Amino acid sequence: MPTNFSAWDSLPISTTQRAFSETYNLEEKERKEAADLNKNYYYGKQEGDVVLMNDDVNPITMNITKPIVSKRCSLLYSRPLVREWDGSPRSIAYLEQVYKDNKIDSLLGKVDLYAELTGSVLLHPTIDENLPGQIRLVLYDASEFSSAGNDDDPNTADAIALTRILSRLVDSSGVTSDGRRQPQIEKTILQQIWTNDAVTMYEGNQVVVSEPNELGFLPFVNFQGEEVHNAYVGYPMATIVRKLNSHINQLLTHIGYTIKMQSGTPIVFSGFKSGETVVVHPGRAINIPEGATANVLNLDPKIQESLDFIKYLEDRLYTTSSVPKITVEGGEGRSGRELMVRWFPLWKVFQEKANRYNIYEMQLANMILTIAGLEPINDLKIHWPEESILPLSSADDNLERDIKLNIVSPIDEIMRRDPHMSEIDAEAEYMLNASQNAMLNQTNQVL
């Protein structure tokens, strides 16, 4: 008789135990392995993922993952950003110091990259008395942590388990079958599990130390690659790219081996009797017995058809990742508007990410202020680098006309291109450029 189990019959377990068991969950293990594989593909470590038919096959790989992921991560933090804070002067001054200490735009550029590769990145503010602001922001990508979800709000977490593999020498006297010494290495999982109440360190399944969490909350801000409904860890867009990249590598390897086989000119012999041999005269001819035949094996590898299919997969790869090929390899359009249309999918990615990252940065800022015991800020406006997203905008098409009609001024345009520049500095640069251009025009007229 089947047994019906009810949630009412089970014993409750602590949040720490839930986070501990989540680390050993099979699906969680596969998720982390996929995240690591995405990173390997991005950094060009792809040969180990190619399936070889035999030892005579050499893997051929082409790293398409890196340019596509890099393009998606070049949208937000391509230059130092201007941030407008709404809050108390003391809180704003402290945030600016912490951001300066941590080189925030460079750090968040890495956050963006690893969120694309692994699905999520946690930024963890920790105390560092060696820094002027005494806060260091530590990055953990989704291959380095597990989470115990909140049943009421699965988009949040009740616990975070920071994980790493610990290797320890347990026996240095081991000897292999050929007489060589082979030290025995034991690998265990080291976990630091954070809950609202405690911070517990595990080595394997043993508790090393457990301390109260004096903050009373989880000091982590979750930057997601792509938000997933009712999930704390986001989706890594690099997974789509990596899987198609894997198929392309496999096809390239097959083609390379086929060409290698074909260049060897395989010959098929038939009609031989027992004991008869083939005499080969290098560079001239082959002697075969009477009645026997020798034919060149036509492999018919259909190389061009295979290359066409690879090109099709490559095109689909760019399309499914919302990175138009023109944005990576370059290209021209008949007008700025045509280029805008072709770049539009990437522009939509920029808009969606900018909206989310503005929220993430707001959460990060207020978490830093909470840890420091300062008043939270009310609002944050980030001047994202829109000018670097498209090769040409409709405003650029009409810029000369707008200046002539006094809709905008050259000083406005200088400040748009460099938001850090004040109006006085922009005016000074305009006057300097105008003077230099006038001198060059006079020189050209004399010549």
Residue ranges and their predicted role:
Residues D112, E116, L122-V228:
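Extended, regular secondary-structure scaffolds
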Residues Y202-V341, H383:
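Extended, charged amphipathic alpha-helical segments
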Residues M1-V138:
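Extended, helix-rich architectural segments
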Residues G87, K110-D112, T126-I127, K260-I267, ...:
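Short coil/turn segments at secondary-structure boundaries
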Residues A34, D105-Y114, G119, L123-H124, ...:
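C-terminal amphipathic alpha-helical
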Residues L95, E314, A365, P410-I411:
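Generic structural marker for isolated residues within well-ordered, non-membrane alpha-helices
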